[in-house]
Structures are given as structure tokens and as C-alpha cells.
Amino acid sequence: MAFLKDLYKNKVAKDLQKEFAYSSVMQIPKIEKVVINAGIGNAVADKKHLEAAISELTLITGQRPVETKAKKSIATFKLRAGQSIGAKVTLRGDRMWAFIETLFNIALPRVRDFKGISNNSFDDQGNYTLGIKEQIIFPQVVYDDVKSVRGFDVTFVTTAKTAQEAKALLVGLGAPFQKVRGDK
């Protein structure tokens, strides 16, 4: 599963250095980590929803997630401070590259009516956040074992200084962005 890592080292990094005229190899943007976050609203009423989400995220990422807890009590939602309401995983190294490869090449093309990922989800620091609506697009999740369909957020944390650099990095790695009028 090191195909994307090799692609980055051998091709994408060199292309980025030429495109943005970096003077040092250390200036070339790279992906530092991928953070997957799932907020489980049903976990307040029933702990089984949280356990199911954790097991599905474990299957998808190959790493056990950490439970996220509520910071404040909110009476309207019957939520107490410190109560588990979600899960998150931070992927680095080989697991990160394997997840990115699975996401771009297998999972996203399985989305119904998929036209590409949004061009507008970059922040000012060159990070990209993507929302996944259904966990069943991943081949690791068995459709018959899923009790409820839930989504999660995927954040690509990069060393890029601008959104333009981050987009060039992700496009080089094969991210299927939406076509904008005028693009080839």
C-alpha cells in the first residue's frame, strides 16, 4: 500500500518544487496527518451507537479511535459534561498513506452520483476537510453488519502555506476534485 508514498516522493514532490519554485526541499508541502472525526449524536441515549461507530472506524482505519467527550452540559440535548459523544482517529505514516489510497481510489468512486470533492473546503493554513456521509462506501465495512448509516469528517493536515499549494499536493496524489468551468 506504499504506492501513494512512492508517488509523492518520486513525482509529486518534484512537480510541486518546479511549479512553486521552492529553493529548498524542506519547503515542499507534504501531508503530516489525517484526522477522522465522527460525532455520534445518538450516543447520548444509547452507548451501543458509540461502540458500533468505534468498531467501524477501527475497521476503516486499522487503528482504534479515541472517544471524544462533551466539554459542556447542554440540558436541551440531555448532555452532561464529560459524556462520550464521538470518536476520532489520527493517522500518520503508512496507515495514513493506506487510508488516503483507499479513500481516493476505492471509497469515493463508490458514492452515488459522485462528481468530485469540493474545491472550497480548504482553510487558510492549507488544510483540507472532507465530509463523508456514509461509512458503507468503504470496502472494509460489511453492509449487512451496519445497524445505522453514519458519516464522519476527514481532515488532511498539510505543511502547505496556502490553499493553492495544498490543492496542488492533493491533485498530484489523485484527489478527485470537481471540475470547474475552464479546467481541463
Curated annotation (Swiss-Prot):
Matching SUPFAM superfamilies: RL5-like
GO biological process: translation
SS bonds (residue pairs): none
Listed InterPro entries: Ribosomal_uL5, Ribosomal_uL5_bac-type, Ribosomal_uL5_C, Ribosomal_uL5_CS, Ribosomal_uL5_dom_sf, Ribosomal_uL5_N
Cellular-component GO terms for this entry: ribonucleoprotein complex; ribosome
Keywords: Ribonucleoprotein, Ribosomal protein, RNA-binding, rRNA-binding, tRNA-binding
MF annotations from Gene Ontology: rRNA binding; structural constituent of ribosome; tRNA binding
Pfam families registered for this protein in UniProt: Ribosomal_L5 (PF00281), Ribosomal_L5_C (PF00673)
Family, similarity comment: Belongs to the universal ribosomal protein uL5 family.
Functional note: This is one of the proteins that bind and probably mediate the attachment of the 5S RNA into the large ribosomal subunit, where it forms part of the central protuberance. In the 70S ribosome it contacts protein S13 of the 30S subunit (bridge B1b), connecting the 2 subunits; this bridge is implicated in subunit movement. Contacts the P site tRNA; the 5S rRNA and some of its associated proteins might help stabilize positioning of ribosome-bound tRNAs.
NCBIfam families the UniProt entry points to: PRK00010.1 (NF000585)
Subunit record text: Part of the 50S ribosomal subunit; part of the 5S rRNA/L5/L18/L25 subcomplex. Contacts the 5S rRNA and the P site tRNA. Forms a bridge to the 30S subunit in the 70S ribosome.
Protein name (Swiss-Prot/TrEMBL): Large ribosomal subunit protein uL5
Protein's organism: Ureaplasma urealyticum serovar 10 (strain ATCC 33699 / Western)
